[in-house]
From Swiss-Prot:
It comes from Homo sapiens. Most actively expressed in the developing lens. Detected also in embryonic brain, lung, liver and kidney. In adult, it is more abundant in heart and liver than in brain, skeletal muscle, kidney and pancreas. The keyword Phosphoprotein applies. Residues 227-242, 320-337 have a biased composition (Basic and acidic residues). The Prospero-type homeodomain and the adjacent Prospero domain act as a single structural unit, the Homeo-Prospero domain. The Prospero-type homeodomain is essential for repression of RORG transcriptional activator activity. This is Prospero homeobox protein 1.
Length: 737
């Protein structure tokens, strides 16, 4: 019963203290706090010190002061616990021992000054209670009038909790001693001497929050990270060492390879059997031998340009084989030692020479057999062919006069761009319209028009020079394909719009009208011809034809429209042409007097003698665009000139056949002045001049697109083009009228 009363009294006092210092109340807090206080107090002192302290307190205050001593002990225990909160587990014992020494030395007021146990008001109340307890202790300690706890009961109660608390404290200290906090241990003295600025509640929460983060795990994580870094450094070092070793091995291999290559190269220079040209020739020879074994049907399917390429390579190899004995003789005379040519090399040279001669003859025979299977009638040549470089090839064994470097450069276009379909002697083109293996770009005219070109056959001329290849195999060369595009004005006016070439006088051919082609036309033809020569090295060549037909066929090939070629012929007066001529340009200029904005369908209708494609259509449209550009430039020029002259009204502006503007336009579109300009064109020109005048007067020329409004007005003023312009011979009819 006394034990129960003492426990209840201590529990109530503890609750009061917790309320005073602001600690939140929880269930079972009083008993747990009391047990913790007693265990902490007695664990800090050895048994001897504990008994001496208790005896000293009992002797000093006597039996009447037991409650006061117990209160002070509890107060000190509470202060011990509050003071130990901020410190780690490894320093709890040292702190308790230090507090015990301070107590024995009479430094008890330090606990009150620390502010850890209670506030000033609480200490004052306890002093009053302690003073009154000397007179009537039961009234102060036990409000219910119950007796106090005896010394024996207190010792027994403390001994019960001492062992359990001591074991727990030792276990905590043992677990936390593995990772001591150096920073907190260095600041112990500062925390003891200086008053704490935080409350015990905040200190307690901070301590619990720190305990939730085990330092042992942090240290192990740091150790793991450092171990991984060290492992990566080691791996990097090993990889670097392996790379250096591999580089050393690579350098050694390169040195060995260079030594072997140098020795092999020196042997090749001495023997002359493994040069680069010979290796290439062996590959070409193997391909040629494979092609010889094929059947005639397989040969017909191949591109004839391949045979010529192989033949040219074989000829070059034959030249090398012929020069080998000379080099061998020079080597023997120079060395007379073990570096001379071996018997195997001689045998290889002889065998190679024989195989080359055999392969060359077989290739030539195969080409002749394939392209002479269908005899045809040769088309008569109207324009004399150009000259051919001498001695293109030499096949027979007796003639070994090969090209020098300068001769090869002179016939660059003919060698690089071979003519695989040169006509053979006594071999003529097929008279039917059936397509052969290689479709020519310019096909002969229909049989119904043979009589029209009969008189022109007398103008056919044989080539001035004949190559050894032609003399050996019976070839007759056709028109030489020049490696560069022919000038546009180099060919005569063989179009159906003009007269025959024989009727053109020197004056007509050299007149400014005949040379009046725009820069777009010339550049277009030049670009097409160059593109054709660079992208079609093995394309079929033309039969004997005029230079005009050659140039036009190049444009046709560039445009990519190679269908229905049987309808195209530059020799017929009624057949379609492949390109535009100067007469077409003159016709377009005359049509500009009637229409300024022709459509593509109109162009196809009035240029019915031209085989239309994408290039032809765009060129005609470009012509009319240039016509309009010149037309509008002149109109703006004379409109500004009229404004400068003081003209203020459009009524003063008029165009007659005597005015300067009309003469400028007529000189550009009708240079020969052999065509009568229609009156409608004068009206349109006058309207255009006035539109420019009004726009400039109104200040609209500030806008960059101010001419668009004028263009919309002029495009509606086009008139019908006369039907005579649909005729291919419209220029002759118009000029004769």
């Amino acid at each position: 019963m006394p034990d129960h009363d003492s426990t209840a009294l201590l529990s109530r006092q503890t609750k009061r203290r917790r309320v005073d210092i602001g600690v939140k109340r929880t269930v079972g807090t009083a008993s747990a706090f009391f047990a913790k206080a007693r265990a902490t107090f007695f664990s800090a002192m050895n048994p001897q010190g504990s008994e001496q302290d208790v005896e000293y307190s009992v002797v000093q205050h006597a039996d009447g002061e037991k409650s006061n001593v117990l209160r002070k002990l509890l107060k000190r225990a509470n202060s011990y616990e509050d003071a130990m909160m901020p410190f780690p587990g490894a320093t709890i014992i040292s702190q308790l021992l230090k507090n015990n020494m301070n107590k024995n030395g009479g430094t008890e007021p330090s606990f009150q000054a620390s502010g850890l146990s209670s506030t000033g008001s609480e200490v004052h109340q306890e002093d009053i209670c302690s003073n009154s307890s000397r007179d009537s202790p039961p009234e102060c300690l036990s409000p219910f009038g119950r007796p106090t706890m005896s010394q024996f009961d207190m010792d027994r109660l403390c001994d019960e909790h001492l062992r359990a608390k001591r074991a727990r404290v030792e276990n905590i200290i043992r677990g936390m001693s593995h990772s001591p906090s150096v920073a907190l241990r260095g600041n112990e003295n500062e925390r003891e001497m200086a008053p704490q600025s935080v409350s015990p509640r905040e200190s307690y929460r901070e301590n619990k929050r720190k305990q939730k983060l085990p330092q042992q795990q942090q240290q192990s994580f740091q150790q793991l990270v450092s171990a991984r870094k060290e492992q990566k450094r080691e791996e990097r070092r090993q990889l670097k060492q392996q790379l250096e070793d591999m580089q050393k091995q690579l350098r050694q291999l390169q040195e060995k390879f260079y030594q072997i290559y140098d020795s092999t190269d020196s042997e090749n220079d001495e023997d002359g059997n493994l040069s680069e040209d010979s290796m290439r020739s062996e590959i070409l020879d193997a391909r040629a031998q494979d092609s010889v074994g094929r059947s005639d049907n397989e040969m017909c399917e191949l591109d004839p340009g391949q045979f010529i390429d192989r033949a040219r390579a074989l000829i070059r190899e034959q030249e090398m084989a012929e020069n080998k004995p000379k080099r061998e003789g020079n080597n023997k005379e120079r060395d007379h030692g073990p570096n001379s040519l071996q018997p195997e090399g001689k045998h290889l040279a002889e065998t190679l020479k024989q195989e080359l001669n055999t392969a060359m003859s077989q290739v030539v025979d195969t080409v002749v057999k394939v392209f002479s299977a269908k005899p045809s009638r040769q088309v008569p040549q109207v324009f004399p062919p150009l000259q051919i470089p001498q001695a293109r090839f030499a096949v027979n064994g007796e003639n070994h006069n090969f090209h020098t470097a300068n001769q090869r450069l002179q016939c660059f276009g003919d060698v690089i761009i071979p003519n695989p379909l040169d006509t053979f002697g006594n071999v003529q083109m097929a008279s039917s319209t059936d397509q052969t293996e290689a479709l020519p770009l310019v096909v002969r005219k229909n049989s119904s028009d043979q009589s029209a070109s009969g008189p022109a056959a007398g103008g056919h001329h044989q080539p001035l020079h004949q190559s050894p290849l032609s003399a050996t195999t019976g070839f007759t060369t056709s028109t030489f394909r020049h490696p560069f595009p022919l000038p546009l004005m180099a060919y005569p006016f063989q179009s159906p719009l003009g007269a025959p070439s024989g009727s053109f006088s020197g004056k007509d051919r050299a007149s400014p009208e005949s040379l009046d082609l725009t820069r777009d036309t010339t550049s277009l033809r030049t670009k097409m011809s160059s593109h054709h020569l660079s992208h079609h090295p093995c394309s079929p060549a033309h039969p004997p034809s005029t230079a005009e037909g050659l140039s036009l066929s190049l444009i046709k090939s560039e445009c990519g429209d190679l269908q229905d070629m049987s309808e195209i012929s530059p020799y017929s007066g009624s057949a379609m042409q492949e390109g535009l001529s100067p007469n077409h340009l003159k016709k377009a200029k005359l049509m500009f007097f009637y229409t300024r904005y022709p459509s593509s369908n109109m162009l196809k209708t009035y240029f019915s003698d031209v085989k239309f494609n994408r290039c032809i259509t765009s060129q005609l449209i470009k012509w009319f665009s240039n016509f309009r550009e010149f037309y509008y430039i002149q109109m703006e020029k004379y409109a500004r000139q009229a404004i400068n002259d003081g003209v203020t009204s459009t009524e003063e502006l008029s165009i007659t056949r005597d005015c300067e503007l009309y003469r400028a336009l007529n000189m550009h579109y009708n240079k020969a002045n052999d065509f009568e300009v229609p009156e409608r064109f004068l009206e349109v020109a006058q309207i255009t001049l006035r539109e420019f005048f009004n726009a400039i007067i109104a200040g609209k020329d500030v806008d960059p697109s101010w001419k668009k409004a004028i263009y919309k007005v002029i495009c509606k003023l086009d008139s019908e083009v006369p039907e005579i312009f649909k005729s291919p011979n419209c220029l002759q009819e118009l000029l004769h009228e």
